[in-house]
Every structure is written in structure tokens, then in C-alpha cells.
Amino acid sequence: MDLVRFGIIGTAAIAVEKVIPSMLSAEGLEVVAIASRDLDRARAAATRFGIGRSYGSYDEILADPEIEAVYIPLPNHLHVHWAIRAAEAGKHVLCEKPLALDVEELSRLIDCRDRTGRRIQEAVMIRAHPQWDEIFDIVASGEIGEVRAIQGVFTEVNLDPKSIVNDASIGGGALYDLGVYPIAAARMVFAAEPERVFAVSDLDPVFGIDRLTSAVLLFPGGRQATLVVSTQLALRHNVEIFGTRKSISLKNPFNPTPDDHCRIVLDNGSKLAAAAAETRRVAPADQYRLQAERFSAAIRSGSPLPIELEWSLGTMKVLNAIQRSAERGNWETV
């Protein structure tokens, strides 16, 4: 199978620290070019990773006829603009999350996909990690009974005034930077969409972003998911899944490193003691590499993408409803 030739649009930290190194070790693709608005930054990244070509503008990399697909790690407010530009230039697109800032933006991207015939995917890398396949198998087996509640927590500390996460004007804040993860976890495990949400946010008085957002998501049949995301609380990543017979705790659900043995802890609820728990380990995996490989394989085979834009549209509807609820103080329909 011919390798899918990728260009990287931007030199964001997530690209240079996580995604590019993983893509370089992936099968079925090669990274042939990288672009930045600062040519020196592009050249430095190209030298660091042994990438053949570097460009000082995004337009230049889109004009490169050898590039078939692009990875976009730009700030949130630029995702849709450059994804559309890339698709119109004939490139397939793997774009960081959140894919858009609102439903209208994402609908325009879906229209662009349908018009151009290019493949466009949101980079929700957790879906590629095998620990989630193990979770789905456990839930489907009925071992934990009927799943009625899910809790997701993603907190970290980022007080950098230069960070895009702390710029409200470009889609920063805890909800848009971190909320995608626990929302994805709940939607994947329930295999359903929430109907209503209620949320509260605490705004940073200097940055103007939501530094803490909590939300309740009501799913069909009375099932519930709760989430807490923050950019100014001590680091914690956790997902709890509650069934009528057992509960599941994922100890590193979102950002396991390629050498992490992920732990899935099942508790039968018979007593509040460690003896009631069973730990299952999932072999280490590089979720960024797997994400890139599966995206590339879908391009070559013409098979469905691991995550289609319609699924991302569902995420966007939830994010927007949470934001409305936090602003208005009301339950909001998704």
C-alpha cells in the first residue's frame, strides 16, 4: 500500500511533543513537510524530526502537490477555516479537537466534505487506544450490569498568560480545551446522545476563560453523566463507570503515554475495601500513532473513518449546550 504523504500545518506543542513523533513511527504514512507562519520555526521543527520540506506559510504547504493529507494542530478558532482551505486544496484532513467552536461552523465543514469528497476527521485520539475497546467489551458482556451513571474528570494547572488555553477570544478555557474528553467517554460508553444538560462555570477574573466547569448530562432512560474540567486545579484524569452489579475506574483514560500499562479497576461493591476490586491491565499502546495509522488506512481503502464528522457534530451540540447552560443558569436541550 502506498504511503499517505502528510503535511503538518503548525508547530503547536501537541504537534511537536506528541503527534509528530508518533506519526514518524507509524505505518502507512510519511510526514513530508511542515509549515509555520514563522519559517525559522518550521525549519527548526523539520530539522529536529528529519522532515524534508518546511514552509513559512500555510498556503504554501497546501499548494504542495505531493501532500495528500494534513494534520492541523492550530488554535481552536482556526480549525474550521484551515480545514476547509485544506479540503478545497484537495487534501484530506486530520484536525485537533474541538473541531469547531459551534454547530454552525461544523455544519459548514460537513458541507465542505460533501462538496469536495475529502476525508475529514477530528483527532479524538483516545478512541484509538485499546483500553477503550476493553471497556466496551466489559460493558457489552453485562459483567457490570446495566450502566446507569458515568463520571469524568479532567483537571490540570495552566496559568501561562501566553497560552492559547487562557485566551477567551480564540476558544480557550476548560470546557473547550478539556471537555471533549469526558463528553466523548460518556457518549461512547452509553452509545447514545444526551438530551439535556445543566452546567455551572467559574470564570477567571484576569483571563476571562472558564477555569472550572461542571455539568450534568441526562441521557435517554434516566442515565446520567457528570463531568468536571478545570485549567486551574491539581492534575487528575479519571473516568468512573457505574453499573448495577459492578463499577469500573479508569486510572489514565485520556493521556496514557506509549509505555503506560493502563489500569481498569472493577469493583463489585460488596465492601469499601481494596479486596472487592480487581485490576485488569491493558498493554501499552501509542494512541497518536494508532490514530494516524487508522486515518491513513481509511484514506487508502475508502472505508469509513474511525470518527466521522457527524459524531463530532454531536460533540459540538453538547459543548454548545453546556456553554449556554452555564451562561443562562438553565437546563438546556442538546
UniProtKB/Swiss-Prot annotation:
It comes from Rhizobium meliloti. Gene3D superfamilies: Dihydrodipicolinate Reductase, domain 2 (3.30.360.10), NAD(P)-binding Rossmann-like Domain (3.40.50.720). Keywords: Oxidoreductase. It holds the Pfam family GFO_IDH_MocA_C3. GO terms for molecular function: nucleotide binding; oxidoreductase activity. This is Uncharacterized oxidoreductase ORF334. Belongs to the Gfo/Idh/MocA family. Its EC number is 1.-.-.-.
